Amino acid sequence: MIPTLKAEFKKLLTVRSTYFITGLVTAFVIFITLYVIGWRMNIHDLHDPAQLADAATGALTMSVFGAIVAVLLMTHEYRYNTIMHTLTSSNSRSKVLFSKFIVASVYALFLAALIGILSPTMVYLGVHLHGHMLVPQTLHYGNLAWRVLFYGWGFGMAGLLLAVLSRNQIASIVGLFVIPDVIEQLFGLLLKHNTVYLPFSSLNQVIGNSGGRTDTSSNLSPSKAAGVYCIYLVVGWIIGWYLFLYRDATKLD
């Protein structure tokens, strides 16, 4: 298990796209939070005690890039035809998949923590560089930390799961944008208030994002929303694990 895990970390850390995406996300978050939100903040928002907490969760939409890194970690194997070597170098397909799961989780948590810490820090800095001052902020660190980390991890696991199911890089990346922004929105027209139980809708509610819905009275609590999302992940990963074990088994093993 350890050699397989080391090999997966090596793949993550030797691919240029990992550093490019991390740098891109960092630069974008700094620009948006330091200048657009912090420097240009209006006087009314300076009196909002939840401004920094909102900044920490608001920028988490960039976690989709953590999911893209997870997609690349899996689909590069199929795109460059290295999957046979990866599978034959380990005595268990489950170990390979679990190693990718761990590596993708570590990166997703790292990126979420980076965004969650960088965002409020840059907002605070932007406000002060402009000569203003925020009112005393209300920050429930424990509650904020688990929601930030869960959201980033949840998006990363969704990306990796899509990659396991489709084995196609383009389809997986497109799915990360189309499923929450198009498909779930269409289902919302039919499900009405029950839209809150859809996968990405429940994930959004972990950080208090209504996903564009105007009626938030039916919103789930963050902990309940996390539980709903975990159910989807468990079911999805059982299917993904089964397919990874037995799809093309005679061809690749």
Q: What are the residue ranges of the model-derived segments?
A:
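Binding-cleft/active-site segments that stabilize strongly anionic ligands or cofactors
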Residues: V174-G175, L190
